[in-house]
Amino acid sequence: MAKRAVKDHYENLVELKYQLYNSLFLTLPLDAVEQAGLLLPLLEESSHSGLADGLDPEEILEKFFMSHRPSMTEEARAQFLFKIIQYVERQVVLIDALEDAAYSEIHRTEESNKLRQLVERTESDALQRELKSTLASFGARVILTAHPTQFYPGAVLAIITDLTEAVQSNNIATARELLQQLGNTPFYQKENPSPLDEASQLIWYLDNVCYEAIGDISDYLEKYLDTDNLDSESLLSIGFWPGGDRDGNPFVTAAITKEVSAKLRARIIEWYLRDIKVIRRRLSFPEISEKIEEIEQLFHKELTNQIPACFSSPKELISILNKVQSSLEDNYQGLFVDKLVSFKRKIQSFGFHFASLDIRQDSRVIASTLDEILETHPPLLSSSFENLKEAEKIAELFSIQGSLQIELLSSPSSLDTVSYTHLTLPTNR
């Protein structure tokens, strides 16, 4: 789509609606609005003119207060500026909601669907085989990063979601109530978010974006390429930083890594439980319904801590579903088999981990840990290890025989490095 067309749509669907909803915001009985909302346009004008005249921020504010609130004390000025920040924060949230509500129309996602265009073009040019071959070696990895300043509190995220829906349906009354809720909801957090808090915030995006989107993309490709052999996990995967990025967050420990991975596993099983309940409503046939109910019960038992794991691996679950699929095709005219196959694709994509934790650590910490291990466990590596080439060092590290006595290590960073390495070994193997 031409840039001009996008700009026009943005002006009509976001900027004009912003004027409407911001006007609603100004009518609400909110402290920040009453103290700051009406003066904000004047402060904006003073800032523009002051910068144009070469004034610094302190001079701009002094001139503004002398012109519009000359009797304000220093404390009152500080309080006023704080209210300005509160008000602007909520204006930004309003814009976020308006942009989300208008995104598909602004960008004409149905018309500019690049994936659909690609598939249709390969069909018209008889290049389906080439596309299949390309996809067999293609992979895209979405990385969900984390930083405390990136996140709205959970309550604000929920308001954005509901406000987006109200805007899309032109429900002015509900939007006004949500704006009032927004004005009374704090944006600050009493404590800095922990790595577990960051993980919980990002799981919101896994739930509300990634799960359905990746499932839809996999279904679309396999339907239009007429194949069920795509490697969904390799084609689209998700990396997850919270709980693993030790080089970026000193509060990440092996215990946090384990807790985040358990949280991710529980969340994806909750999704599978929801989906299998929907499937069970359709697969009401003899024997098949019993098998689907067994799967549902196993999911439920793991989530309620009645059993340690519902299945030994995703492959075990897929093997059971393959048998159900064969029975559907052989005995029940393949009825609703598409729903079962779509569910299998999600299992192939997300496994029981949902997103893979990106375990990262400063190389200096790893080197220091290795040095301490060699000092306390000299027989583990050859005496010439330091003189080996990099490839030879790697080969020797992977061929180590023997066990590590963790109680001999004294450095906290070494203890944590060994602990999280031990956690990841079953996955790597």
Model region roles, listed by residue range:
Residues F251, T427-N428:
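A ubiquitous, low-specificity "background" feature that marks scattered single residues
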Residues S403-E407:
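Active-site-proximal beta-alpha loop/turn segments in soluble metabolic enzymes
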Residues T421-T427:
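Conserved small/polar residues in nucleotide/adenosyl-binding loops
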